[in-house]
């Protein structure tokens, strides 16, 4: 159900201009008035308040409950830009991700919201079901699944943290005053930090630079971490393949298959 534009107008006042923020759900809007700009969203998680307090997302201005029970949140709309792929190898990204992964406040809130730590075995079972559902039996995918099965016992890691689970460069915003934010937290999980580190390093950082990037993040590149990162980026790639196949996104499906081909060569080399 979309946000009621008339209700928003009454909430903010007639002086505010309100327009959709994009996306198919109708759940997000921009509003502006006298140089002030807000980003409005319906039914954001209570997690947003902690992310705002920690300085990880743009500041939460207010939260209001609508007559139908929906909750609208308003955040400062930041003027700035998305990061470019080349920006992802820099220190600011490493330091912000480290801040997220070591935040007790974020972890406590996700636990209060009922999130359970991700189990790699359960993730692999879901992945195999998704592949079976789209009848995708390509030898390359089966090779990838075999790798995940063979190394499952090696990826159990005790220290679970809050993971964003979609660290694509499009989700990192750099404001005009050089403040970095990570947005779009709908898929956040309690998991092995390698779930974020793997996709980020494999997609954005040259392999010879992994050690120096992880040094900025604050840890060493161990063989255990190397394996866990490979495991999670591989599982993510196969999940994307099954998802695009199910949606009938032919171009994205073939692109993901090519990515899997390259990834398997990198992992086994």
Curated annotation (Swiss-Prot):
Class in the EC hierarchy, top level: transferase
Summarize the record's disruption phenotype note.
Cells lacking this gene are slightly thinner and longer, but no anucleate cells are present and they have a growth rate similar to wild-type cells. Significantly decreased DNA replication initiation rate. Suppresses the synthetic lethality of a dnaA1-yabA deletion for growth on rich me. Susceptible to a broad range of DNA damage including mitomycin C (MMC), methyl methanesulfonate (MMS), ciprofloxacin, phleomycin and UV irradiation. Significant induction of the DNA damage response (SOS). Not sensitive to kanamycin or gentamicin.
The Swiss-Prot or TrEMBL record annotates one GO molecular function as:
ATP binding
Question: Sorted alphabetically, which keywords does the UniProt record give?
Answer: ATP-binding, Cell cycle, Cell division, Cytoplasm, DNA damage, DNA replication, Kinase, Nucleotide-binding, Transferase
Which SUPFAM superfamilies does this one have? Protein kinase-like (PK-like)
Name the reported effect of residue 243 to A. Answer: No effect on activity
Location(s), subcellular: Cytoplasm
Q: What is its main location?
A: cytoplasm
The record's section on Gene3D superfamilies has:
3.90.1200.10
Q: How is its activity regulated?
A: Activated by D-ribose and 2-deoxy-D-ribose. Slightly activated by kanamycin and gentamicin.
What binding partners and quaternary form does the record give? Monomer in solution. Interacts with DnaA (via domains I (1-82) and III (111-326)). Interacts with DnaB. Interacts with FtsZ.
Cited function: Plays a role in cell cycle regulation and chromosome integrity. Activates DnaA-dependent chromosomal DNA replication initiation ensuring that the chromosome is replicated at the right time during the cell cycle. May regulate replication initiation through phosphorylation of a possible second messenger or metabolite, and by interacting with replication initiation proteins. Has ATPase activity with D-ribose and 2-deoxy-D-ribose in vitro, but not with choline. Involved in DNA damage response.
Protein name, per record: Cell cycle regulator CcrZ
Q: State the species of origin.
A: Bacillus subtilis (strain 168)
């Amino acid at each position: 159900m979309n946000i009621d534009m008339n209700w928003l107008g009454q909430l903010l006042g007639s002086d505010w201009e309100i327009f959709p923020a994009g996306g198919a759900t109708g759940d997000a809007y921009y509003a502006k008035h006298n140089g002030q700009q807000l980003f409005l969203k319906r039914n954001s998680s209570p997690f947003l308040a902690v992310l705002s307090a920690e300085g990880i997302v743009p500041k939460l201005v207010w939260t209001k409950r609508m007559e139908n029970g929906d909750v609208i949140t308003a955040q400062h709309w930041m003027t700035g830009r998305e990061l470019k792929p080349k920006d992802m190898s820099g220190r600011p990204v490493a330091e912000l991700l480290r801040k997220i992964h070591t935040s007790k406040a974020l972890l406590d809130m996700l636990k209060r919201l009922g999130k359970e730590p991700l189990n790699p075995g359960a993730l692999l079972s879901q992945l195999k079901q998704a592949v079976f559902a789209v009848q995708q039996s390509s030898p390359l995918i089966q090779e990838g699944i075999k790798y995940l099965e063979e190394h499952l016992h090696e990826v159990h890691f005790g220290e679970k943290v809050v993971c964003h689970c979609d660290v694509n460069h499009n989700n990192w915003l750099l404001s005009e005053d050089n403040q970095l934010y990570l947005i779009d937290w709908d898929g956040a999980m309690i998991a092995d930090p390698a779930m974020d580190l793997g996709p980020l390093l494999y997609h954005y950082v040259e392999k010879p630079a992994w050690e120096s990037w992880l040094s900025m993040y604050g840890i060493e590149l161990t063989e255990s971490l190397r394996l866990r990162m490979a495991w999670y980026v591989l599982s993510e790639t196969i999940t994307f393949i099954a998802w695009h196949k199910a949606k009938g996104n032919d171009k994205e499906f073939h692109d993901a298959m090519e990515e899997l081909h390259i990834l398997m060569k990198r992992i086994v080399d």
